[in-house]
Amino acid sequence: AAFALSGLMEAARKRLDAVGVCVVAFLAAFGGGTLRDLLLDQRPFFWVQHTEMLWGVLALCVMAMLFMRQRHFEVTEKAILWPDALGLGLFTATGVHHALQALMPGVVAVLMGLITGVFGGVLRDMVCNEIPTAFKDHRPYAVCAFAGGWTYVGLWFTDAPGWVALLACLVVTVGLRALALWRNWQLPAWRA
């Protein structure tokens, strides 16, 4: 729901129609996990197995569109940052978990977490005709997911309970992203 909300808000900011809003919300919610499933050769895709996720995102889209129209809600870029940070943490943890369950090495699991966490937002931005925030915003984004992913892997290999690894990954990822936004941390830009 967190990434779907960020997709929905970005689509609303771009003033897309109802179909466009739903498409962008679905891409943001399921794009990274679908790419992960493709790379891990897992079929059917997670959202095909769990159709309640599809219904949940659709319900979120309908409710949000009704709420935003009735309230004349203006979506700012800042409003998108927090649902996006939460989605980044949740999806990173989920991606790492799926890869470890598929018996992938730690480094592959971290990369699958990174892909799951980042690429839904990349697809969201591309469809909205933007350079993906993950690539242009010099405040750490993928780096936060990378650190959170390694936190999960480290706890996994010390036989910590799964919920502890998931929660730690979430806290590290979202916490680092929040610090990066609050303190305006910047990664160096590539100079040609």
Give residue spans per PLM region:
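Structural signature of hydrophobic alpha-helical transmembrane segments
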Residues: 1, 45-59, 105-118
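The first (N-terminal) embedded transmembrane alpha-helix
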Residues: 1-6, 19, 23-27, 147-148
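C-terminal ends of transmembrane helices
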Residues: 4-14, 37-38, 63-77, 122-133, ...
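Short, structured motif recognition centered on aromatic/hydrophobic residues
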Residues: 23-27, 34-40, 111, 115, ...
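Small-residue-rich segments of transmembrane alpha-helices in multi-pass membrane proteins
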Residues: 24-33, 81-97, 139-153
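Helix-coil boundary and interhelical linker segments in multi-pass alpha-helical membrane proteins
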Residues: 38-48, 94-108, 153-165
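Ordered, amphipathic secondary-structure segments that act as subunit-interaction surfaces
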Residues: 59-98
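Small-residue-rich transmembrane alpha-helices that serve as helix-helix interface/gating elements
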Residues: 115, 165-179
